[in-house]
């Protein structure tokens, strides 16, 4: 069985990645200690840097996830700063910022960074299009899930099993798995 260290302190992200990868015979080990995060406007260099930094530090294959919600009416805000905005403002303030906005389109993007010790990092993006709901709906998921609507339901309403089939993270992991299984 392959072992990959997944770097996150987020229990929801870890559970989602673990549940997806275990069906492919990959054991995922959580590493809660983070890494010096680059301040960039794009997710790809952040994920690549993090994966390479931790892979070389732990001397093990490492996967990191950098994700963001990009709201078109807000010029892509909060984007790569989504975690900070969620911590400081929360969903209700994001909804307040969206008051009066007709364009509620948004997308979630995850970039999986993967690196083996001493090698160059690889990145695998995944995107899911949707829109910002008018209010929080659902109790499932985490982060922006209760305000991100996909095909009529928020990620918070979908439940973990259904969300894990269609999420941005799932799409990024699928890209990773396509590469990973082709090299095995």
UniProtKB/Swiss-Prot annotation:
Quote the EC number: 3.6.1.66
Q: Keywords on this record?
A: Hydrolase, Magnesium, Metal-binding, Nucleotide metabolism, Nucleotide-binding
Catalytic machinery residues: 66 (proton acceptor)
Q: Which reaction does it catalyse?
A: XTP + H2O = XMP + diphosphate + H(+); dITP + H2O = dIMP + diphosphate + H(+); ITP + H2O = IMP + diphosphate + H(+)
A GO CC annotation given for this chain:
cytoplasm
Q: Which GO terms describe its biological process?
A: nucleoside triphosphate catabolic process; nucleotide metabolic process; purine nucleoside triphosphate catabolic process
Q: Which residues of this UniProt protein bind substrate?
A: 8-13, 67, 142-145, 163, 168-169
Q: Which residues form the signal peptide?
A: none
Top-rank taxon, per record: Archaea
Please list the cofactors this protein needs. Mg(2+)
One GO molecular function term? Answer: ITP diphosphatase activity
To which protein family does this belong? Answer: Belongs to the HAM1 NTPase family.
Alphabetized HAMAP family for the sequence: Non_canon_purine_NTPase
Descriptive protein name: dITP/XTP pyrophosphatase
Q: State the organism's lineage.
A: Archaea, Methanobacteriati, Methanobacteriota, Stenosarchaea group, Methanomicrobia
